[in-house]
Amino acid sequence: ADNPGDDGN
């Protein structure tokens, strides 16, 4: 699962 702080920008 992706971390909640990971915005992908």
Swiss-Prot record:
It is an enzyme of class 1 (oxidoreductase). The keyword Oxidoreductase applies. Optimum pH is 4.0. This is Peroxidase. GO terms for molecular function: lactoperoxidase activity; peroxidase activity. Optimum temperature is 70 degrees Celsius. Its EC number is 1.11.1.7. Keywords: Oxidoreductase, Peroxidase. It catalyses: 2 a phenolic donor + H2O2 = 2 a phenolic radical donor + 2 H2O.
